[in-house]
Amino acid sequence: MGLVETQAIVLQTYKLADADKIVLCMTEKSGLVRGVARGARRLKSKFGASLEPFTLIQLTFFEKETRELVTIKGAEIVKSYFHASGSSEAFEGLVYILELVREFAPPHHADEKLFRMLRACIDFLAGAPEHAAAVSAYTELWTLKLTGFLPEFKSCGHCGVPLGETFRGQRFISHEGVLWCQDCRKGGSQPLGAEAYRLLSSTRKRAPAEWSLEFEGASEESMRVVSETARRLVRRALEREPRAGRASAAPDA
């Protein structure tokens, strides 16, 4: 507790009283933080444009153990992604990515991997808006993985037979994201080809740009299965649809 200095990405802001803001940030050292920035809405505020969404900042805040809201003392822009809002694809993708982190990241729980993943995805998407659908799916899978909601995709959910990359039989996947071998598959499961399996299990081994190119080079069926699986797992974890939509890589079945 006390004074904290950390890099942060501004996720969302709210008006407070006549001149203040409440700012929601994903920070490198403290996880998801909600803070009050006094005077942030004044014309000559010391914060300037640093507390706008889609901005990477060096943040200084004061934290008390008994209070959920921190007090923001200073913020300096490291990098702004606001220019990306000029592209509808990039804007929608950024909004969706920020929402995923806002929904899944627990408050005041440091997760440097989640912060680095978020920064890498925003960096790539801001410069390559045409990859919005792929980056959204990548972010879904990584966020699910880091917060414990992504299945391992290593073995049959019933008999336990290994279903990794060396498996030569047919895999099936349920609506809950559980893998089945051919002998154990249940009604409602769909085939999971080798290409789609590699995409689902390779996010942690690939940077956003590399995975996006691999995803977009796959068959339309593989893109559809991966995209739908990631989306279903997000819905299942949240127990509802995300408030912000995301671009689809392929038509829904």
Regions of interest found by a model, annotated:
Residues 1-253:
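Non-catalytic alpha-helical scaffolds and adjoining flexible linkers that form interface surfaces
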